Amino acid sequence: MTLEKARALVAAGVFCLAAALGGGARADQVYQGCAQPGPAGKVWYLDPVNGKTPAAGGNGSQTAPWNSLTGVLSFKFPPGYTRPLLSSVPYFHVVDGKRVYVADQLGSPPVQPGDTIMLMSGNYGDIVIGDYLQQVVNPSFVTVEAARGQTPVFLTLYIRSTTKWVFKGIKVQSLFGTNNSKLPLVTVTDQGAALPSSNIILENMQVSSADDTDGWTQPEWLARARVVGISAKGTDHGANTTCVSVTNSHISKVIFGAEVMANNMLFSGNEIDRFGDDGIDYVASNILIAKNYIHDDQVLGNGAHMDGMQGYPGASSNVVIDSNRVIRQADPKLPFPTYLQGIDAFDGDWTNVTVTNNVVVTSACWGILYASVHGGKVINNTVVADGLMPQPGNCTPGVVIKDKTHQGSSSSDVIIRNNIANGLSIYNLDPNMTMDHNICLTIKGKCVILTYVGGKPKWGVFKPGEYADHNIIERNGAAGMFVSFNPATFVYDLRLRPGALAIGAGNSAEAPPVDITGAPRAGRVDVGAYQHAPLK
């Protein structure tokens, strides 16, 4: 997908929602060009508490539900099931006197691709889709969904080498080591180019190590919490797991929130909180990370480098990060608060990266930072220090483009524009590097704008005033800019207050057409993530 198309999707507030799918079909949020579920097939019911096996009279109806999801989806079907009830699942059986491991219609399996499986409340155990060196190929989407008013629970969900699944409204929860499993709570992966995965939709998932971690000590956190909430990770730098979408889900009480490491991936509308390392780790091509809320990270004593979103080593292209909020601490009762870098990539090599409309409130040196970025746009973000945790050298979160990472080449063709931050820096010795129409928000009367002259950093720009390319160091700090900014009570309303210097001070070139709320940027463009509107 081109960068322009990605931004257009963000501007519209939708992500390839099907406009007319036909009778019975619904629109799901997926990355542009990925498959959508078609018309719905039959609906089946499972109940792990009151259901029965087929042998005992269960027929999958609402009045006689089956009792095992494993019996429907897995080659390891339990007693009372003579084969997987879903026809696309390979399994061992005898055909024409020979033992084979294939998917077929032998025995008239009732569940077909295109059908929906409704789950009643109860514990379904560890759910595994796919097998070693085998692939489950669905020509149409199979939907596994919580029935209305029900809370089905999986211990883990492991999806590999398969196609076309929707999981919706499922709670996935277990402690680290449950059933000897150290896997992420939810995994989507492949087994190489010959056994890929594609078109996996996860919607409205509730993913956590436990409901309540209050009272856990830091060692107990490290011993009990799952290492990763949701992991979508393809081999060959994301190429063999594609078209994964994770939307409107809640990931909580884990060490790492999510891994966005599959090509053509959408990660949108999710909340990640109470985590002990990074909120989102990402490295892939054609990914859209939008409208997520990441907050309340915790220090657990394991030496973690804390990041809201961190880019990983590898070559990535066509990355859009738009309209996210990264708030270091929103809960006054958070047990182990700590610093949190915002949105960054210290490693890897990045081509066509757009970072727009994001809000970062933190105690850290880096609010938004990239290096080895080529064709980058960091536009209309708001990055401010909460001032609650002193940092080495009294650094404050800024918007920064550096020269290069450990693995990548020097940055080129990058724009820093229309941002509000407590510091601004660009390695302008690289070709086609632009920094204009930004506002440097003072703390105690100072804010540093760092550029390079003759190969050396120019440190002397920190006093209020207007500098080159309409970059402004303002005088009044956060109190003069935002509707409400009160770190003492963890209240951060970063809309622009009437009369704020940022109103109308932006550059319309390359600015996103809507702000973080979806409001249009019509006429004069404001600086920061929010376009000003009269308060109601």
Residue ranges and their predicted role:
Residues 42, 115, 125, 140-142, ...:
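The right-handed parallel beta-helix/beta-solenoid scaffold, focusing on the short coil/turn
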